Amino acid sequence: MFAILLISQMKTFTLKSELKSYLNGIRKDKIVSFIPTMGSLHEGHLSLLQKAKESSDVIVCSIFVNPTQFNNPSDLEKYPRTTEIDINILTEKKCTILYLPEVSDLYQENEQVKQFDFDGLDNFMEGEGRKGHFNGVATIVEKLFRIISPEKAFFGEKDLQQLQIIKYISKQLQIPIEIIGIPTKREESGLAMSSRNKLLSETGIQKATLIYQTLKYIKENSDNFTVDQLKKIAIEKFSHQTDVNLEYLEIVSLEKLQPISEFKDANENAACIAASISSVRLIDNIIF
């Protein structure tokens, strides 16, 4: 039976040295879980927190908008930041520890992003269109893992490619952390919860529902069409929408994230979409 460590108030740290020292003092015989975020928290993040509570004594959340994973400076600048609101949410939800660092606490001046071999997991989709993105993600995740040394780390399946890459590098780097993926939290319309949704207009939110509708169509019709036929039908759905720009639509193997020509067994396939709604870039996927 797990009981979240009782503290009078959530502890907040801005320096990794102080965070490590505090964790070293409380972690004996305790399960420490970690949830990395870039802030602008929503119910999707909170579902990770809720799941972590079921098997943890200490929960560490981080809020850090990692500059090295943005290959578009304007995207970094526009990324929504709601730090005070986020702190209040985490306090209310009884997060144990918040790590809220500045860039200088995690990166040295002029530090080069580490280059990883992802064994082809980054060849398509996000890796193809956002060069260097996953090296930036893996760099910061490795840093955070080594600072916090959790037993478990929780990630949303909405960022499926990121999740699979983090699982892979954790094994390659021999970091003994259980990586746990949590199903995507959705609005009633099916739209995947995302911090970027805050940048959408009401009309944009309505148009964005096409993404999940298309993914669901692919899943429900995988017994009726070939992969190529389904891709063609699905892509056609986007051609009739104004202000909706389909960046990619791929049907891939869940394990390797490589495009497939024939469907695999149940729960070994994934359909993945990236699309911009009036310049707001959204991603989503469905596993089937």
Predicted regions and their residues:
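Nucleotidyltransferase catalytic core that binds NTPs
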Residues: 2-243, 256, 279, 286
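A C-terminal functional module that forms or caps the active site or interfaces directly
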Residues: 238, 250-288
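Active-site-adjacent helical/loop segments in soluble small-molecule enzymes
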Residues: 243-251
